Amino acid sequence: MSVLFLLLAITRTASVKAAEGDQAADFLPLCEAWQATKALANAAYKLPPFPPDLTDILNFNITVAPEEWKAIFTDGGSDNTWERFAEGHKNTLNGGNWKTRWEHIKQARQDTKEASSPWNALNSKLINTATVNTTRAYIASIADEAFDLYQGTQTPLQTPKALEAASLAEAAKAILCSDPLKPTADGQACTDITATPSKAATCPTGRSSKGGAPIGLDTVCLCSTNKPSMHSRRRKAAAVMTDGQLKDGILKKLLAACPKKPTLNEPAAAARHAVTVLATRLAQKVARAEEGQIILGTRAETDCASSGSACVEYTNFFKDGDGLAAVPWVKKLLAAADFYDTIEKRKESDKNAATAIAALKSALIREFRRPGQEQTLATTGTKSSSPQSTQQKASEAEANCNDKAKETECNSPCKWDKEEKDEKKRCKLSEEGKQAEKENQEGKDGKANTTGSSNSFVIKTSPLLLAVLLL
């Protein structure tokens, strides 16, 4: 805010009488915009790599999975694809889709199938084999949640249309430079004015054409004039023209007179600050410009391209009602600032996802160390009973059958045994019922979770049945 008041004070003094350094306040916002653009050009975004913590989670998950499930992924060859598997198991998959996970599960199986593998050498001792059956579903739910977090980081960022470039680095080149100033290879500068061309042939003239294409050319045209009173002592010799000819290498010399650092360190904020100060300067100039011209600087002759003027004209952008945001370099600079903010937010989101995946791995390892049947679900913080053993479930089913005292009540999966001496046990669980109960329980143990998510590690049928179908 103090900078803004200072610039306003400079403006009011200049409006009374042109003096040495009159254009300094008009020059500074261009300096700020130049420096902010260079800082924005350095910002880039890459999709994060596959997290090592997620690799460990998937490896733990496949290690505790039923053997029938492991068999699906044991073949690490290129022919073992999701598409091939899905085509052969349309009915048993029941809408499940592992396409994004398939290759990662295959890799997890390759990492763990040999007992002497490097991963097993480091991690197998963490697995509590005594509680595998009770932890299996919980570990799989962690794998699901962790993989979903990773998938959320894999959507490419789309550059905004207003940027008119594929990256901030490419956008910066257009913001800083245009003919006759070409961007350098690194995008951090422009080639300079050479061979002293005329200002009238190089700078935009009058209302028939517009300034504002790049910052570099606006800077050259603003500061190139034949009147020494328009410049500070530091730039007087460098910028003062003779015979209306621009000075050789003038852009580099002008930029050397800019402050070494922008007012604000954060690039997007610095860019918006530069545009705000520029808008303030233009607003102060309207009252003293003829016929409502919108100019940056001071017009001394017919237009800003004349040798006696030190200005850049933006009238046409305001005449059409679009205002400062329609000036090409301003429009692109603001779009670049917005995209920079998007990149920073995405980086923070990716960092949070990595932290959450690491926390899930820690929860997984704690679960291996915790005895007992009761599991705590990481996603909700609520408790649910872990899958009971096959033997327990079979015993419960047998007891349910035994409760049937009459043959007419003893229906499938129970079977009436009239030869049984114990009258209380004549209705008993059939062999088919016992097998169904076993397969049902093994299916629960082999699932990643019990939600039925279509893109999870769940095959919506018994892994044992799937293994049979693969044969």
Curated annotation (Swiss-Prot):
Residue span of region Disordered: 373-457
A Pfam family reported for this protein in Swiss-Prot or TrEMBL: VSG_B
Record's GO cellular component terms: plasma membrane; side of membrane
Membrane-related topology note: Lipid-anchor; GPI-anchor
SS bond partners: 401-414, 410-427
Glycosylation positions in this chain: 61, 133, 449
Biased composition (Low complexity): 379-392
Bias type Polar residues, positions: 448-457
Propeptide, residue positions: 455-471
Primary location recorded for the protein, binned into one broad class: membrane
Biased composition range(s): Basic and acidic residues: 401-447
Key words of the record: Cell membrane, Disulfide bond, Glycoprotein, GPI-anchor, Lipoprotein, Membrane, Signal, Trypanosomiasis
The protein's role, per its UniProt record: VSG forms a coat on the surface of the parasite. The trypanosome evades the immune response of the host by expressing a series of antigenically distinct VSGs from an estimated 1000 VSG genes.
Presence of keyword Membrane: yes
Signal peptide start and end residues: 1-18
Gene3D superfamilies: Variant surface glycoprotein MITAT 1.2, VSG 221, C-terminal domain
Protein name: Variant surface glycoprotein WRATAT A
Domain of life assignment: Eukaryota
Residues where lipid is bound covalently (GPI-anchor amidated serine): 454
Cell compartment(s), UniProt: Cell membrane
